[in-house]
Amino acid sequence: MAVAELSPCYQTQIVKPPHLSWLSNNHKLNLLGLPKASRITEICCSLAPNQVQTPVAVPTGAQSIKPECYGVFCWTYDLKKEEETRSWKKMITIAISGAAGTISNHLLFKLASGVVFGPDQPIALKLLGSEKSFHALEGVAMELEDSLYPLLREVSIGIDPYEVFEDAEWALLIGAKPRGPGMERADLLDINGKIYAEQGKALNAVASPNVKVIVVGNPCNTNALICLKNPPNIPAKNFHSLTRLDENRAKCQLALKAGVFYDKVSNVTIWGNHSTTQVPDFVNAQIGGVPVKEVIKAQKWLEEEFTEKVRKRGGVLIQKWGRSSAASTAVSIVDAINPLITPTPPGDWFPSGVYTNGNPYGIAEDLIYSMPCRSKGDGDYELVKDVIFDDYLRKRIKTSEEELLAEKRCTAHLTGEGIAVCDLPAGDTMLPGEM
C-alpha cells in the first residue's frame, strides 16, 4: 500500500474545534462554552484512485478545502484521471432541508445511489439542519461516507441556508415544524411560512438562477407559494409542492379495486391542496388504457370510499405503524423528480403542485395548486389541456381552491401582500399524517 508523505503548506490559520467546523461564522459566535481555537500549520495532500501525488504547497490566500465539507468528501477527486468517470455528466448540486429527519434519511441514500438522476450523474449533496439537529446531521454524513457511493462526490452540512443553498440546482425542502397538540392551522401556516420565506430569500441570493424547488414540508402548497414569492430572480414555474404521495395512494386504491397491478393505472390527477379537500380524479384516470369508470362500475365507491381512502391513508398508517409515512414519502419525492427529468409517456400525465398563473382550468391565479402536467424531461413542464370535467369534479376543485385562497390571505404578511387576514374554512382539513 502506497503511503503519501505529508509536507507542510506553510499557511498558518486559525482552526476551530472539528465538531463545529461546518457551522457558519455567525452561529459559531453565538454558541457558548466553545473549546479555545488553536493555531496550526495546515497540512494538505491530494488523493486520486491508484495514485498518490507528491504534496504541493498551497499558494498564500488559496483555499484547500471548503470548511463545510465532510470527511472523505473534503479530498479532491481527479475525475479526469479516473477511467470509469470519463463518460459521466457534469456534477449537479442538490440541497436538502430537514436533512437530519426520517424522510431525508430514506431519501439521501436513493439520491446517492444513482437511482434518481442516473448511473452516470455525479452529485453533490448539501444538507441543511438546525443547531438542535446538527449532531444528527453529522451522523447522516458519516453514514453517507461509509456507504462508498461512487457517484456521491461531495457532501457538506450546515445550519445556514445562505451557505448550504449556494449553487444548488435542485432544492428539496423537507424541513418544517410539525403540528403539535392544540396548534391551529393558522399557527402552523405562520411558523412554517416564516421558515420558507427565509429559505426563498436564501435561494434567490445564492442558488442557481434556474434551481428546481420541491416543497415537502407542510402545509406544502402555501409554503411553496411563500417560498416562490420571496426569490424574484427564480422563475415561478420552478416551484413545486409534493403531490406524488397522494397520487401513488390513489393509484394503489384503484388497482386494488380493479384487481390489477398498479402499473396498469395511469392519468391519475390529484387536484388542489394537500389537505382533506384534495380531489383524487377518477374521471380522467385510466386502467389499462380504459377509463376507470368503465372498469370500476361502482360510482358510489368512486365518489365516496375511494376519495376517503386516499385522504385518510396517512392516518391509518400512523394507527398501524405508530409513525408517519417517511419511507413512502421519500419514494414519492423520487417519483416527483423523475417525470421532470424524463419525458412523459405519450397520452399520460402526472400531477404536481404548481403555479396557477395562465392555467386553462379557470382556477384562481397566484396559487400553488396541484394540476396535471406533462414534461419533455428537461426539468420544465406544461399543463395538460385535454382533461374532462363533470359537476362532481368542478365542485370539489372549487372547494380546494377556496381553501388555498384563504391560506394565502392568512400568510399575506409573508408574501409581501399586506396584512394577514385569517378566515380559514371551518373544520380541520389537515391530513392526519401532518399532526
UniProtKB/Swiss-Prot annotation:
Organism for this UniProt entry: Spinacia oleracea
Gene: MDH
Site note Activation of NADP-MDH, residues: 69, 74
SUBUNIT field: Homodimer.
Regulation: Chloroplast NADP-MDH is activated upon illumination. In order to be enzymatically active, disulfides bridges on the protein must be reduced by thioredoxin which receives electrons from ferredoxin and the electron transport system of photosynthesis.
A biological-process GO annotation: tricarboxylic acid cycle
Localization terms from the record: Plastid, Chloroplast
UniProt GO MF annotations: L-malate dehydrogenase (NAD+) activity; L-malate dehydrogenase (NADP+) activity
Predominant subcellular localization, coarse grouping: plastid
Role: The chloroplastic, NADP-dependent form is essential for the photosynthesis C4 cycle, which allows plants to circumvent the problem of photorespiration. In C4 plants, NADP-MDH activity acts to convert oxaloacetate to malate in chloroplasts of mesophyll cells for transport to the bundle sheath cells.
Protein name: Malate dehydrogenase [NADP], chloroplastic
Broad EC category: oxidoreductase
Residues reported in the UniProt entry to bind NAD(+): 199
Catalytic activity of the protein: (S)-malate + NADP(+) = oxaloacetate + NADPH + H(+)
CDD domains the UniProt entry points to: MDH_chloroplast-like
Binding-site list for NADP(+): 98-104, 192, 216-218
